[in-house]
A protein has these predicted regions:
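Helical hairpin unit composed of two closely spaced alpha helices linked by a short loop
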Residues: 1-44
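C-terminal regions of RecA-like/P-loop NTPase motor modules
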Residues: 15, 28-38, 49-134
């Protein structure tokens, strides 16, 4: 199940809940749904605007919009980062970073891939023998 984008899901409408509480309840419900149906649920979320104010634009867990419970409930949190999105004047090297910020059952880290913008396609970077030996 893919949810594009989590913050568009309407809350329960119960009085007294703010949007952060609603998003937390939605996040918990999706986690319960995944367990009940024994299927993965991929929920896309928007980042807060604070990313644009920082020098280093790479997204962090605290940038997830409207709820800390999203990062708590998730088994995996991954971000996409393209330097050329923020530095349009710079040289586009055609790469994208997948930042694995949280993985409940494994390691975290970054993976750099080639990004073919015309096709919205990710491909493995070619590793030359010279680069691999350095």
């Amino acid at each position: 199940i893919v949810i594009d984008y989590l913050q568009l899901i309407a809350g329960s409408g119960r009085g007294g809940e703010n949007r952060q509480q609603e998003v937390s309840a939605i996040s918990r419900s999706l986690k319960a749904l995944a367990r009940e149906l024994e299927v993965p649920v991929i929920a896309l979320s928007q980042l807060s605007r604070s990313v644009a104010q920082r020098q280093d634009k790479r997204p962090m867990m605290s940038d997830i919009r409207e709820s800390g419970s999203i990062e708590q409930d998730a088994d995996i949190v991954a971000f996409l980062y393209r330097e050329d999105y923020y530095d349009r004047e710079g040289e586009n090297d055609g790469t994208i970073e997948i930042i694995i910020a949280k993985q409940r059952n494994g390691p975290v880290g970054d993976v750099k891939l080639a990004f073919v913008k015309e096709y919205n396609k990710f491909v493995n970077l070619e590793v030359r023998y010279d680069d691999a030996m350095a």
